UniProtKB/Swiss-Prot annotation:
GO molecular function terms listed in the Swiss-Prot or TrEMBL record: DNA binding; endonuclease activity
Keyword Nuclease: yes
Source species: Schizosaccharomyces pombe (strain 972 / ATCC 24843)
Miscellaneous note of the record: This protein is coded in group-I intron 1 of cox1.
Source lineage: Eukaryota, Fungi, Dikarya, Ascomycota, Taphrinomycotina
Pfam families reported in the protein's UniProt record: LAGLIDADG_1
Keyword field: Endonuclease, Hydrolase, Intron homing, Mitochondrion, Nuclease
Presence of keyword Mitochondrion: yes
Family classification: Belongs to the LAGLIDADG endonuclease family.
Function: Probable mitochondrial DNA endonuclease involved in intron homing.
Protein name (database record): Probable intron-encoded endonuclease Cox1-I1b
Broad class of the protein's primary localization: mitochondrion
GO biological processes: intron homing
InterPro entries, per database record: Homing_endonucl (IPR027434), LAGLIDADG_dom (IPR004860), LAGLIDADG_Endonuclease (IPR051289)
The protein's Enzyme Commission number: 3.1.-.-
């Protein structure tokens, strides 16, 4: 009980500091003569949007974690104020979301990893009024509305593209369609190639882009070549031809796990809960094997289990070794950018603090409910 008392006391102190700093910063910014009226209006709108966004998040958090348990209270207070204080120099409380980047973090490699997990390259044809075909290329990343933060992080770093909401599916989509924007993203994927079978989607996507950009081809020739690409897409290979050992980096892996990884707690018996880590992919056995070696070395590599389901073969890289869990907890600290960061912090804290069974059960239920909010069709390991 002592650790809980300390957490509660710290929470009260943090709350007073946070509210005090909010008032101080607002008074300074709104009364400063250095800021124009337009600047003040923009600031107020920014604070309003930030407040409403965090209010929505905190309500979701209460629904997920209905308890006065001090760990939950502390997390909720940090969660509410993280966006505002990440922008100011007086921050004294760490955010539930990571605002820092690991040493030698590469955004471009991270983006390639995230795209390998959740990216989509599309080539579409549309009939227009004069009977001609209009071809369009689209690169997009889709996330649940609850995880819109990560798409904003991408848009802010790239400085291009647009975000829009799909109300019917409760998702947010980051989209690139303009040729000059696609050129920038193509340069990134040329420098750091995709490591999954999406390499071939990108290969045809770039091929189509070059055809559309070729001024020496007339409309008929372009249409003919693009139709050939659509036929070629049906016979794509299942693996990327890229040297995995050369291009698999920590930044790529952070992005890939952000999209495809799972940190979970699994109840093995009525009195025992274990921590686990898993990545599941279709066909990507060589990639999972390389991730295993990259993280854990070949001597302690977890087994990759193949599960045959219909015509698709699923491969799962999973481990629950306490030694490996502690390593992952340290290795990925403050690395993730979206809701995965909150999931990981809860998982990591429950691992390091040696929680009792009841506390682990609460942490497990919280992680599952968070996943149900931001994952499309997420699945959790069944209790044994």
């Amino acid at each position: 009980m002592k650790p809980q008392t300390k957490l509660s006391e710290n929470s009260s102190r943090c709350e007073k500091v946070l509210y005090s700093e909010v008032i101080t910063q607002l008074i300074y910014f709104l009364t400063s003569k250095k800021i124009t009226n337009l600047g003040k209006i923009r600031l107020v709108k920014s604070i309003r949007d930030s407040f409403l966004s965090q209010l929505e998040n905190i309500l979701c958090f209460f629904l997920v974690y209905r308890t006065t348990y001090s760990f939950g209270v502390c997390l909720m207070k940090r969660f509410l104020f993280n966006k505002f204080f990440n922008r100011h120099p007086f921050t004294r409380v760490k955010s539930c979301f990571s605002s820092s980047s690991p040493s030698k973090f590469s955004f471009t490699q991270w983006l390639v990893g995230f795209t390998d997990g959740d990216g989509c390259f599309s080539i579409s044809k549309q009939k227009i009024k004069n009977g001609k075909n209009k071809w369009s290329l689209t690169f997009k990343l889709t996330q649940n509305l609850y995880n819109y933060r990560i798409l904003y992080f991408i848009k802010r770093n790239l400085g291009i593209g647009s975000l829009y909401k799909e109300s019917s599916t409760n998702t947010v989509i980051y989209r690139l369609r303009r040729r000059e924007h696609l050129k920038k993203i193509i340069d990134i994927f040329d420098q750091f190639p995709l490591l999954t079978k999406k390499y071939w989607d990108y290969y045809l996507f770039k091929k189509a882009f070059l055809i559309l950009e070729d001024a020496n081809l007339n409309s008929f020739e372009k249409n003919s070549k693009l139709e050939e690409i659509r036929i070629e897409k049906k016979s794509l290979k299942q693996y990327s031809p890229v040297n995995l050992e050369k291009y698999l980096t920590k930044s790529w892996l952070i992005g890939f796990i952000e999209a495809e990884g799972s940190f979970y707690l699994l109840q093995k018996s009525p009195v025992r809960i274990i921590h686990g880590f898993e990545i599941t992919q279709n066909y990507e056995q060589p990639l999972l094997a390389q991730i295993s070696e990259f993280l854990f070395n070949s001597q302690i590599s977890p087994k990759i289990k193949s599960k045959k389901n219909s015509l698709i073969t699923n491969y799962s890289l999973s481990t629950s070794s306490k030694e490996r869990m502690l390593f992952l907890s340290s290795y990925f600290e403050n690395c993730f950018k979206g809701v995965k960061s909150l999931e990981f912090k809860i998982w990591s804290r429950s691992l390091r603090k040696n929680y009792n069974f009841e506390q682990l059960l609460r942490a497990r239920d919280l992680i599952r409910k968070l996943k149900n909010k931001y994952s499309r069709g997420s699945q959790h390991p069944k209790d044994k």
